[in-house]
Amino acid sequence: MFDELTQRDIDEMKSEIDERIKLRDGFHDDIVTAKSYGDLSENAEYHEAKRAKNKNEARIRYLKNMIKTAKVIDEKRDANTVGYFDRVTLLFEDLMEEQVVTVSTKMRIDATKGVISKESPLGSAIFERRVGDRVFVDVSPDVQYYVVIKKIERDGNSIDIPINKY
């Protein structure tokens, strides 16, 4: 399965890869310096330098794989439906409470700030729906509910939602 990403997501990931590649020499130097301290079995600096290098390399591999397997999506869509980077005001019927969420790509989610993925149960239920639509959200056999889309706002500040670190 491909991850749906915007061209902006891919450009930011490529930029991060370039920055992380520039850090490689520094990690190598840290390892060489730590090795010079002697016995590696009890050398915390050496193990920390290796851990930092490996974490950097893992992030580079992850980002390259995300780019390689990405399906580039077009952010343009029907102006009257929920799309990527829209702020959506929802009425949760069972609680009679309103909540605002922003629908995003997988690389920019942050549930603590109300930024949800299109692939999430709520995101997939409201995606491409219109104001006034009553939508069924199926989280699991035990958790199901209805929401009503009250308002859709185009979020011109989607660039402020950073790429997730992990």
Give the role of each language-model region:
Residues H47-N80:
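Internal alpha/beta loop-helix hairpins
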Residues I73-G156:
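Non-DNA-binding regulatory cores of transcription-related proteins
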Residues R20-L23, D30, A34, L63-A70, ...:
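Conserved, well-folded catalytic cores of nucleic-acid-processing
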Residues K35, I67-K68, A111, S117:
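Residue-level signal for pocket-adjacent positions within structured domains
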Residues M1-A58, I159-Y166:
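N-terminal cationic and glycine-rich segments that engage phosphates or anionic surfaces
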Residues D30, E48, L63-M66, N80, ...:
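Flexible domain-boundary/linker segments
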